[in-house]
């Protein structure tokens, strides 16, 4: 059974391996563990104030992640959205469930805008975000912050 729940520290190493495998091996993105020190400290980096980090598990297996970083002034950044290749697509609807979890939380916490940055080569992700109401925007329309990775070249906005 698939469950979406807030991140628990027992998943730290599995989460780091999961994300790096997708970034490096599946999409050949030039991102290393050292580029993402926040992954080793999810509770302090993502689970404070109005920010949060959720994981999707099938039994004990980590199959998806999504995070929200509070940027202040009602703005948030969608971060670390990853879904295991075997759980992608409409059959499972896992990406949509993860996004719905984040959006529901964002509305409860009175966010007005969500932003995200993504890599050019992640075409399926672009289609997913656009299908779910995100609009492509210029880099200068996105609030600055450490959530923007060097590989991010496409930026999106969603008004809540």
Q: What kind of region is each of these model predictions?
A:
Residues 1-3:
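Extreme N-terminal starter segment of soluble prokaryotic enzymes
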């Amino acid at each position: 059974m698939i469950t979406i729940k807030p991140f628990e520290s027992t998943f730290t190493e599995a989460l780091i391996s999961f994300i790096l495998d997708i970034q490096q091996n599946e999409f050949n993105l030039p991102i290393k563990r050292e580029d993402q020190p926040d992954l080793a400290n999810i509770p302090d980096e993502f689970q404070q104030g109005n920010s949060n980090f959720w994981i999707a598990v099938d039994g004990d297996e980590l199959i998806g992640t999504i995070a929200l970083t509070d940027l202040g002034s009602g703005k948030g950044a969608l971060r670390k959205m990853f879904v295991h290749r075997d759980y992608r697509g409409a059959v499972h609807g896992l990406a949509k469930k993860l996004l719905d979890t984040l959006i529901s939380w964002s509305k409860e916490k009175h966010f007005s805008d969500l932003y995200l940055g993504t890599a050019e080569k992640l075409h399926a992700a672009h289609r997913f975000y656009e299908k779910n109401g995100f609009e492509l925007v210029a880099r200068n329309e996105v609030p600055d912050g450490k959530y923007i990775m060097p590989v991010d070249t496409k930026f999106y906005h969603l008004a809540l």
